[in-house]
Regions:
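Stable alpha-helical elements in mature extracytoplasmic
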Residues: 77-80, 86, 105-108, 123-126, ...
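Conserved C-terminal helix/tail region of periplasmic/extracytoplasmic solute-binding proteins
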Residues: 337-366
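Short, hydrophobic secondary-structure boundary micro-motifs
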Residues: 49, 93, 140, 293-295, ...
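Short, glycine-/small- and polar/acidic-enriched structural segments
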Residues: 30, 61-197, 201-205, 214, ...
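Pocket-lining segment of extracytoplasmic ligand-binding domains
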Residues: 135, 207-301
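Secondary-structure end/capping motifs
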Residues: 265-347
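Short, low-complexity disordered leader/linker segments with a strong preference
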Residues: 1-66, 364-366
């Protein structure tokens, strides 16, 4: 075949092909491109698999440290704690919380002293009592969450123009005698000129977790309840919220985290991580709306609808219930001990710089 015929034949063959030939004319360029793409995809799959395996291995080797936390009660008052858990802030610090609800500061403290719980979450007054008993391995408070009383006064009768002096001659369920809720409420009564020995009856015979039920069952004229229990009682037609105890009492270190001195000394990284997560929770709740907070913490309150949860969160926002940081200030601690002294529950004040360990909270602010 002469050269001219060969060229014509080659041109005709190219016209029949849906793609061009390579320069040598033996392998189509499309096949080369497809081969390259397949190779790239294969390499990507292999690299992705290696990354996934390494990530899984890292997760397996980096196990979370389990912390036994004993909280005084389950309340929207502690929304920053639940937000910190739900948002994964404790996991970010390598911690996993197992929560027990003690139903009373005395029960929380008993569990911590016995080693059944690593960290307690209740009123700092419990730490003061333990220190004054002379225990060598006393309790240190390392992070504060709430800065005022979180209970609301619920009346059996509706009173849109409530005054604290309206309580004269009534029976009230304020909690356990010696606990911060009881003492704070008593402090408010005295500040409003009410003689707590003669002009009212303070029924302290009912356990903390049974107060709402006792009131709904017909006991007393008033009861102090935390949210969402206060709003639920009102929604059920069993009572009416007439006042905020915390708003009337002013700032006081109401709820804080504490542990045995020995535990803190032996586990500084855990305490620092715990405090970091608590701070993140406080900041998150501050920066988000009541509705957003309610959605995040709803799993901790399965029996409360979202609207009521949001209302409860807003109630605490309205009274400025939460600390800006986990630092427990000396003037607030002194005020707590003043309230305890006036209630007749404290003979000797405990030293602030011994009971309160702000090192971990202050590390966050550096």
């Amino acid at each position: 075949m002469d050269k001219t015929k060969y060229i014509i034949k080659r041109e005709r063959e190219k016209e029949k092909l849906p793609f061009p030939l390579s320069k040598k004319g033996d392998i189509p360029l499309k096949k080369i491109i497809i081969g390259i793409l397949i190779a790239i995809i294969a390499v990507g799959v292999i690299v992705g698999a290696i990354i996934l395996i390494n990530r899984n291995n890292k997760q397996e080797t980096t196990e979370l440290t389990t912390i036994q936390l004993n909280e005084v009660t389950r309340s929207v008052f502690y929304a920053p704690q639940y937000a910190a858990i739900a948002n994964g802030y404790f996991e970010e610090e390598g911690l996993k919380l197992e929560i027990t609800t003690g139903q009373g500061a005395d029960k929380v403290m008993t569990a911590v002293l016995a080693g059944q719980s690593d960290i307690g979450f209740a009123g700092p007054e419990a730490a003061i009592y333990v220190y004054n008993e002379g225990k060598e391995d006393y309790i240190e408070v390392f992070a504060q969450m709430t800065k005022r009383d979180g209970s609301f006064l619920v009346s059996r009768k509706q009173n849109d123009n409530f005054k604290w002096t309206d309580l004269k001659g009534s029976t009230i369920i304020p909690g356990r005698k010696g606990g911060v809720p009881y003492m704070t409420f008593e402090y408010v009564l005295k500040q409003n000129g009410i003689d707590t020995k003669k002009e009212v009856v303070l029924d302290d015979s009912i356990k903390f977790d049974l107060m709402a039920g006792a009131f709904a069952g017909g006991n007393a004229d008033y009861v102090t309840l935390f949210e969402p229990t206060a709003s639920m009682t009102e929604a059920q037609g069993k009572g009416y919220i007439v006042a905020s105890v915390g708003e009337a009492a002013g700032e006081i270190p109401y709820t804080a985290y504490f542990a045995k001195k020995s535990y803190i000394e032996q586990n500084p990284e855990i305490i620092q991580g715990f405090t970091n997560a608590t701070y993140k929770g406080l900041q998150w709740v501050k920066e988000h709306t009541a509705e957003e907070v309610a959605k995040v913490i709803q799993s901790f309150f399965p029996d409360t609808d979202l609207e009521m949860l949001a209302s409860s969160v807003q109630s605490y926002k309205d009274i400025d219930a939460w600390n800006e940081t986990p630092v427990l200030k000396e003037e607030a601690f002194d005020r707590l001990q003043t309230v305890m002294t006036e209630a007749g529950e404290l003979d000797t004040k405990a030293p602030y710089n011994v009971i309160v360990n702000n090192k971990f909270a202050e590390n966050i602010l550096k």
